[in-house]
């Protein structure tokens, strides 16, 4: 009798994706983040579903409905804390996943990489509209500041902003539609994840060495299922520690005050995972220029495959490129720090220098380093 998992139409897909999938034998823990992102997405969809059962998307009751969830709903406080901190874990895994892709040259699988960038943008959009829902001070003013950037677009900007708002400012209509967006987008993300995996399984995973691993592959199960299970347990340990011991450490204290359109918070800033992009936005003293730089800071990922000049795929044996990669990492951390600081000296100039170096590292220095390493590897005799 033939095995059901190899013959049944549905089981066959699962079998080829998670059981009999040939995987390179040398992929390190950096390849765990894909599965961890899948776990994060499932946690967010489940906790979000239970929150949506008790939340009301009305300006008069949104804030108190979140308080009601935390006070009166069975384990509502836990569901809310898991959802809020789950978003932070999601972005932490996303940034590490993208960083791994850049370091080991995974971006050369262009279709997988491009779908990944679209996924990143969709997750960022979902997190942004989700942050507006509790209708606290930072929710309201964050929504006002970021949606108002649309008005920088020539000719159609103001009309576009008012169309998104559903009125002349961020109000009841905005909150209702943001809740609708926040509910539907995770399912769009789930569909994109399937497409992402489809393209990935067409080529197979890359590996740390960057050379063709076809001669040495092992089945995904049990080797990588057990490895992913360990990663999953560590992720849950960190998430539960955050949610149970210091659930508000990554949030903004201003969001414990209900939204008040008549009082602006002293420092408007988004959640920590958007601070690097927010710092780039603020570093340009022109509205349209800032918006374009903000978009470019993420969309630049799309051109990375075309900037690859090295003969070797991975940075594993390329010390100059490695150095530049870690400088880029430090640069992004600097931008994250600057994004949370007030707009005054010396933070303004540090932010501007960090923004310029962010783009220069990716567009100029890293491609040049690849070419230089090719030259250094050529025999000189």
Curated annotation (Swiss-Prot):
Keywords: Electron transport, Heme, Iron, Membrane, Metal-binding, Mitochondrion, Mitochondrion inner membrane, Respiratory chain, Transmembrane, Transmembrane helix, Transport, Ubiquinone
Family classification: Belongs to the cytochrome b family.
This protein's encoding gene: MT-CYB
Entry's Gene Ontology cellular component terms: mitochondrial inner membrane; respiratory chain complex III
Cofactor comment: Binds 2 heme b groups non-covalently.
InterPro entries reported for this sequence: Cyt_b/b6_C (IPR005798), Cyt_b/b6_C_sf (IPR036150), Cyt_b/b6_N (IPR005797), Cytb/b6-like_sf (IPR027387), Cytochrome_b (IPR030689), Cytochrome_b_C_euk/bac (IPR048260), Cytochrome_b_N_euk/bac (IPR048259), Di-haem_cyt_TM (IPR016174)
Name of this chain's protein: Cytochrome b
Disulfide partners: none
């Amino acid at each position: 009798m033939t095995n059901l998992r190899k013959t049944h139409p549905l089981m066959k897909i699962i079998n080829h994706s998670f059981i009999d999938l040939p995987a390179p034998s040398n992929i390190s823990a950096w390849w765990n983040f894909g599965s961890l992102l899948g776990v994060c997405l499932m946690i967010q969809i489940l906790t979000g579903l239970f929150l949506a059962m008790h939340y009301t998307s009305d300006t008069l009751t949104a804030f108190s409905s979140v308080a009601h969830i935390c006070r009166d709903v069975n384990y509502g406080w836990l569901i809310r804390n898991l959802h809020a901190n789950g978003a932070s874990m999601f972005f932490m895994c996303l940034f590490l996943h993208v960083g791994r892709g850049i370091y080991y040259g995974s971006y050369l699988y262009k279709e997988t990489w491009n779908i990944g960038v679209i996924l990143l943008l969709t997750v960022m959009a979902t997190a942004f509209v989700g942050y507006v829902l509790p209708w606290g001070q930072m929710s309201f003013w964050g929504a006002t500041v970021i949606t108002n950037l649309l008005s920088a677009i020539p000719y159609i900007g103001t009309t576009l902003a008012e169309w998104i708002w559903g009125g002349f400012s961020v109000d009841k209509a905005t909150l209702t539609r943001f809740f609708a967006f926040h509910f539907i987008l995770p399912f769009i993300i789930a569909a994109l994840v399937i497409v992402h995996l489809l393209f990935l399984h067409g080529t197979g995973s890359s590996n740390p060495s960057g050379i063709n691993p076809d001669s040495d592959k092992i089945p995904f199960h049990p080797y990588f299922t057990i490895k992913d299970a360990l990663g999953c347990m560590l992720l849950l340990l960190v998430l539960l520690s955050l949610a149970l011991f210091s659930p508000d450490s990554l949030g903004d204290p201003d969001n414990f005050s209900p939204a008040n359109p008549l009082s602006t918070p002293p420092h408007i800033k988004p959640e920590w995972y958007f601070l690097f992009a927010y710092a780039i936005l603020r570093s340009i003293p022109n509205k349209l220029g800032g918006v374009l730089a903000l978009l470019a800071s993420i969309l630049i990922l799309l051109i990375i495959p075309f900037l690859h000049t090295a003969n070797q795929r991975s940075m594993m044996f390329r010390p100059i490129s490695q150095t530049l990669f870690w400088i880029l990492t430090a640069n992004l951390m600097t931008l994250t720090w600057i994004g949370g600081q007030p707009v005054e000296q010396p933070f303004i100039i540090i932010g501007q220098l960090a923004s310029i170096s962010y783009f220069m590292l990716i567009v100029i220095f890293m491609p040049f380093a690849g070419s230089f390493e090719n030259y250094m590897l050529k025999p000189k005799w």
